[in-house]
Structure formats: structure tokens, C-alpha cells
Amino acid sequence: MSLLTEVETPTRNGWECKCSDSSDPLVIAASIIGILHLILWILDRLFFKCIYRLLKYGLKRGPSTEGVPESMREEYRQEQQSAVDVDDGHFVNIELE
């Protein structure tokens, strides 16, 4: 039994594609699943950072700052930003001879 559903055969007019059993429910289901898989894969590659960040952290944006004085909020923001900033002093330059 062959897994191929399409066979190309030479004719006088050129190459034709004859689909065998294209009305088979299994072929239709496989085609729909294949198309959905392709669409989901494309969306995943386009929005993977947003999707996985949403799955990891949910809808919360971070710790609540309700009831915290403004000076402490600013200090917290600066700490978070300094943790993200890259320090060039940690890189080592290696020169090859």
C-alpha cells in the first residue's frame, strides 16, 4: 500500500496530476490538520516571545507597588534596570596571533 496520494503521469498534453481517493475522509482530515499545523507554526514563530512570556508569567506584570512610597518604587525600577543593563567590563577580548 502506497502512502502517496498523487501520481504524476506523462500524457500527450504534458504532465498531469491525478489524485487518487481525494474524497477519502482520512486524506481530507490529514490535509486540514496539515494546514492548521502550518498556520500554528507560523504564528508561533512570529509571536513566540509574547506567547511564552504570557504562559510563564500569566497576565501579571510584576510585583504590586500598591502602598509603597514613590521613592522606593523608583529605587526598585533602577535596580531592575541595572540588572538588565550589560556591563562591558565583563567581556574579555582574546586576540589570536
From Swiss-Prot:
Upper classification of the organism: Viruses, Riboviria, Orthornavirae, Negarnaviricota, Polyploviricotina
Family: Belongs to the influenza viruses matrix protein M2 family.
Side of membrane Intravirion, spans: 44-97
InterPro entries associated with the record: Flu_M2 (IPR002089)
Topological category with respect to the lipid bilayer: Single-pass type III membrane protein
GO MF, one example: monoatomic ion channel activity
Activity regulation details: The M2 protein from most influenza A strains is inhibited by amantadine and rimantadine, resulting in viral uncoating incapacity. Emergence of amantadine-resistant variants is usually rapid.
UniProt site (Essential for channel activity, possibly by being protonated during channel activation, and by forming the channel gate and the selective filter): H37
Subunit structure: Homotetramer; composed of two disulfide-linked dimers held together by non-covalent interactions. May interact with matrix protein 1.
Misc. comment: When the channel is activated, one or more imidazole moieties of His-37 probably become bi-protonated.
KW Protein biosynthesis (keyword) present: no
Native source species: Influenza A virus (strain A/Swine/Hong Kong/127/1982 H3N2)
Transmembrane annotation, as ranges: 23-43
Subcellular location: Virion membrane; Host apical cell membrane
Site (Seems to be involved in pH gating) location in chain: W41
Top-level taxon in the UniProt lineage: Viruses
Domain comment quoted from the record: Cytoplasmic tail plays an important role in virion assembly and morphogenesis.
Function as written in the Swiss-Prot or TrEMBL entry: Forms a proton-selective ion channel that is necessary for the efficient release of the viral genome during virus entry. After attaching to the cell surface, the virion enters the cell by endocytosis. Acidification of the endosome triggers M2 ion channel activity.
Lipidation (S-palmitoyl cysteine): C50
Main location: virion
Cellular component GO terms held in the UniProt record: host cell plasma membrane; membrane; virion membrane
Virion surface side: 1-22
Chain positions covered by the region annotation Disordered: 60-83
BP term (GO), one: symbiont-mediated suppression of host autophagy
Name this polypeptide is given: Matrix protein 2
